[in-house]
């Protein structure tokens, strides 16, 4: 079977939920027995989002092979339950950088390097590479931003050329557009959707399907009007309404025959998607019997997307305990030893996620200290693990001023130090310890029990600093347990305190591998204990 290509674009405005549409369609097609992969095109000039502020971009999602990517890849993985790779996120910066390297090497044989054909050819190559490296039957490529944006023009042109290159039966264009709801007048306006589709047509692409983003349902008459003006079959005008839970969306799209229309267009003979298990999960999620409050102490809490995988992993873990997770967003900058009880005291558990830089670290340390002294279940992630060690060094070992070398190069007690292979690294982007690495678990530890007594777990990392082994013996003598280490025993992966309800921190990012129907084990145990703690 020829590889099938589905392209998801957006018009009218950004943040239309294209990623969720792509992920939901991917789930439906996977449940038809098809092998699906998904890819995100980001037209910005950064090589990747690794050095971008979370306030600009939200979370950086890390793949197994160590690519720092757009947060939409997290949606793809969680919805479809697949592991993506470095070919699943392509930026203008990455493409232009590669083209310029080739030009300097003389690989273009003296040609004038241009947007067409050189940039567009490379973009088409990236699409095909993502499909071939995963042996996918179908690749869904989402283009970030809005059709008509200056920076996205080469991407749209590459998508246009794909139809001629691989055949009309192997390509489908899905355009996501807004329907404006004027609440005061009680009216729905379609002009933005019509103009957005017209703009796409001006670039040579006729949409085969429209996905309408709306707060309220549209009428059949309005659907037919949009279909006529946009030259799309009425049945291929799909509504994506606001929902209570994101995981309802695949079911809503299936109810409108979206996946069948896609299969018919691409001439795919695939059985109907069996969504019974997914439907049961959604029904469970919407009828949780308990509630648990978790304090998330972070420095980017003004933008929840900065912690989207963390919050989703907490929710997934809640599903396993039949509990809705109520997140109390606590700005680490506001936390002190004096007010920490007031800010997190009513939470059944505390999570301290990752981050970079000095700002907010003392607040995180205060929250960790509060959890340790008051036996509140606590989970630390990445920087959260490093600051767990700093807090213990200061307040249990008496090492006044102990810190991470990253945050205080003058500290007398650098309990967190730079990794040996990072000492001479000068570039900031793409040089961290990234991707999947194993952790060997300690017998009898809380971590090993959480991971069902596994000997080794593999989880994704994103860090440059590590626990300083010079202090390991002193920590162990004081009761600090190193419950997960690298197979060569050099890198500390998990730490914990015994005798506590749950006091565990890990260097890796377990949330990146959590799924709604398969929650990550460390998160699951944390929430299970927190639910018990809230009784």
UniProtKB/Swiss-Prot annotation:
* Keywords per UniProt: ATP-binding, Glutamine amidotransferase, Ligase, Magnesium, Metal-binding, Nucleotide-binding, Pyrimidine biosynthesis
According to its UniProt record, the EC number is: 6.3.4.2
Coiled-coil regions in this chain? none
Query: Which segments carry the region annotation Amidoligase domain?
Result: 1-268
Question: The organism sits in which domain of life?
Answer: Bacteria
Copy the pathway line from the protein's UniProt record. Answer: Pyrimidine metabolism; CTP biosynthesis via de novo pathway; CTP from UDP: step 2/2
What reaction is this protein's catalytic activity? UTP + L-glutamine + ATP + H2O = CTP + L-glutamate + ADP + phosphate + 2 H(+); L-glutamine + H2O = L-glutamate + NH4(+); UTP + NH4(+) + ATP = CTP + ADP + phosphate + 2 H(+)
Characterize the regulation of its activity: Allosterically activated by GTP, when glutamine is the substrate. GTP has no effect on the reaction when ammonia is the substrate. The allosteric effector GTP functions by stabilizing the protein conformation that binds the tetrahedral intermediate(s) formed during glutamine hydrolysis. Also activated by magnesium. Allosterically inhibited by CTP.
> Looking at the keywords, is Lipid metabolism present?
no
* Record carries keyword Ligase: yes
| Record-linked PROSITE patterns | GATASE_TYPE_1 (PS51273)
State the Gene Ontology terms under molecular function. ATP binding; CTP synthase activity; glutaminase activity; identical protein binding; metal ion binding
Identify the residues that bind Mg(2+): 72, 142
Q: Where does CTP bind?
A: 14, 149-151, 189-194, 225
Q: What does this protein do?
A: Catalyzes the ATP-dependent amination of UTP to CTP with either L-glutamine or ammonia as the source of nitrogen. Is essential for the synthesis of CTP de novo. Contrary to other bacterial CTP synthases, the lactococcal enzyme is also able to convert dUTP to dCTP, but this reaction may not play a significant physiological role. Regulates intracellular CTP levels through interactions with the four ribonucleotide triphosphates.
What family does this chain come from, according to its entry? Belongs to the CTP synthase family.
Q: By what name is this protein known? A: CTP synthase
């Amino acid at each position: 079977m020829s590889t099938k290509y589905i392209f998801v674009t957006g018009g009218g405005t950004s943040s239309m939920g294209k990623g969720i549409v792509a992920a939901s369609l991917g789930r439906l097609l996977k449940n038809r027995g098809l092998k699906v992969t998904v890819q995100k095109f980001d037209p910005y000039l950064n090589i990747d989002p690794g050095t971008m502020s979370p306030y600009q971009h939200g979370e950086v999602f890390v793949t197994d092979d160590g690519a720092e990517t757009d947060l939409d890849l997290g949606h793809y993985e969680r919805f479809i339950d697949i592991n993506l790779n470095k070919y699943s996120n392509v930026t203008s910066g990455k493409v232009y950088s590669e083209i310029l390297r080739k030009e300097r090497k003389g690989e273009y044989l003296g040609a004038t390097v241009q947007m067409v054909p050189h940039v567009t050819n490379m973009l088409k190559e990236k699409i095909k590479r993502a499909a071939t490296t995963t042996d996918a039957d179908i690749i869904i490529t989402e283009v970030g931003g809005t059709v008509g944006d200056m920076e996205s023009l080469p991407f749209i042109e590459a998508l246009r050329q794909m139809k001629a290159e691989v055949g009309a039966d192997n390509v489908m264009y899905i355009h996501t557009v807004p329907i404006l709801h004027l609440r005061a007048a009680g009216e729905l306006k379609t002009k933005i959707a019509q103009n957005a589709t017209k703009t796409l047509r001006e670039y040579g692409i006729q949409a085969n399907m429209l996905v309408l983003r709306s707060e309220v349902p549209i009428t059949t008459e309005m659907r037919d009007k949009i279909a006529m003006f946009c030259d799309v079959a009425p049945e291929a005008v799909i509504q994506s309404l606001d929902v209570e839970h994101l995981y309802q969306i695949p079911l809503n799209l299936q109810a409108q025959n979206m996946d069948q229309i896609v299969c018919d267009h691409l001439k795919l003979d695939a059985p109907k998607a069996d969504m019974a298990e997914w439907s049961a999960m959604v029904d469970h999620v919407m009828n949780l019997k308990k509630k648990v409050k978790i304090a998330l102490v972070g420095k980017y809490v003004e933008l929840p997307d900065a912690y989207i995988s963390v919050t989703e992993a907490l929710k997934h873990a809640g599903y396993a305990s039949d509990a809705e997770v109520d997140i109390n967003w606590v700005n680490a900058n506001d936390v002190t030893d004096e007010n920490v009880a007031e800010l997190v005291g009513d939470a059944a558990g505390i999570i301290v996620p990752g981050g970079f830089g000095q700002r907010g670290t003392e607040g995180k340390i205060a929250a960790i200290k509060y959890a340790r002294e008051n036996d509140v279940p606590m989970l630390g992630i990445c920087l959260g693990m490093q600051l767990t060690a700093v807090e213990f060094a200061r307040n249990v070992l008496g090492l006044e001023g102990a810190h991470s070398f990253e945050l205080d190069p003058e500290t007398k007690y650098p309990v967190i130090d730079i990794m040996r292979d990072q000492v001479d690294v000068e570039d900031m982007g793409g040089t961290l310890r990234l991707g999947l690495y194993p952790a060997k678990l300690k017998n009898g530890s809380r971590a090993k029990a959480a991971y069902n007594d596994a000997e080794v777990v593999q989880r994704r990392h994103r860090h440059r600093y590590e626990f300083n082994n010079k202090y390991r013996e002193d920590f162990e003598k004081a009761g600090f347990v190193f419950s997960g280490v690298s197979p060569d025993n050099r890198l500390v992966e998990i730490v914990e305190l015994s005798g506590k309800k749950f006091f565990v921190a890990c260097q890796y990012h377990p949330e990146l591998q959590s799924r709604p129907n398969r929650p990550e084990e460390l998160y699951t145990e944390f929430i299970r204990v927190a639910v018990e703690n809230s009784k």
